[in-house]
């Protein structure tokens, strides 16, 4: 994808036509199924990020000496900011930008590390004999499972076809813009 991204960025109209021919799909392309692996991965990433948030913010509020009943004052802005970053990267990935996909994969790795760290912390608390609410342990296991499902949905032939479709559409949009600029110059 990185090489095709560079070729699209520097290509003329005829070179873009060649790139689009390389990215032609065998059979019929269903545009509604094109982004499903990416959307599934994004939803699983969001769920995996959300799982450790209550325990994380309860710990922050406890250490800061703030009232525990206001913990959602930390959770809501944190998750909203994460959603903004996540959906920006997902949207740019769907538009065919290599750096956005790379950024999304880095974000996904960070979330997987957070979920794994939360699971290890909960297991350590459990084995040390601290009284834990079973919901926190279940949420830590679910966070790791969502991270694994997120990686798995990106490691499918459907996502590979989707990336080809994203790049094809980006090349088509750039070719259309170049054609439009050429037409406007010829009219002037």
Write out the residue ranges for each language-model feature.
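Membrane-helix interface motif
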Residues: 49-62, 120
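Loop-to-transmembrane helix junctions at the membrane interface
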Residues: 87-113
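Short, highly charged, low-complexity non-transmembrane loops/tails of multi-pass membrane proteins
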Residues: 1, 157-188
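Hydrophobic alpha-helical transmembrane segments
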Residues: 69-77, 130-140
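Cytosolic juxtamembrane helix and N-cap/initiation of the first transmembrane helix
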Residues: 2-51
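Membrane-helix boundary connector in multi-pass membrane proteins
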Residues: 116-138
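Short juxtamembrane and helix-loop transition motifs at transmembrane-helix boundaries
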Residues: 34-41, 60-72, 98-102
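Generic alpha-helical transmembrane segments
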Residues: 47-53, 67-88, 111
């Amino acid at each position: 994808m990185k090489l095709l991204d560079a070729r699209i960025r520097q290509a003329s109209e005829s070179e873009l036509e060649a790139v689009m021919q390389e990215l032609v799909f065998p059979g019929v392309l269903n545009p509604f199924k094109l982004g499903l692996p990416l959307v599934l991965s994004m939803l699983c990433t969001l769920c995996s990020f959300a799982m450790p948030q209550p325990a994380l913010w309860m710990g922050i509020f406890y250490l800061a000496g703030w009232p525990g009943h206001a913990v959602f004052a930390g959770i809501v802005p944190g998750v909203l900011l994460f959603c903004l970053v996540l959906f920006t990267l997902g949207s740019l990935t769907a538009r065919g930008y290599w750096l956005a996909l790379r950024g999304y994969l880095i974000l996904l790795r960070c979330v997987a590390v957070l979920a794994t760290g939360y699971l290890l912390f909960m297991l350590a608390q459990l084995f040390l004999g601290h009284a834990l609410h079973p919901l926190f342990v279940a949420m830590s296991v679910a966070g790791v499972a969502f991270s694994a499902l997120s990686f798995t949905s990106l490691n499918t032939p459907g996502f590979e076809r989707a990336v080809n479709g994203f790049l094809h559409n980006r090349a088509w949009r750039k070719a259309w813009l170049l054609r439009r600029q050429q037409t406007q110059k010829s009219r002037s």
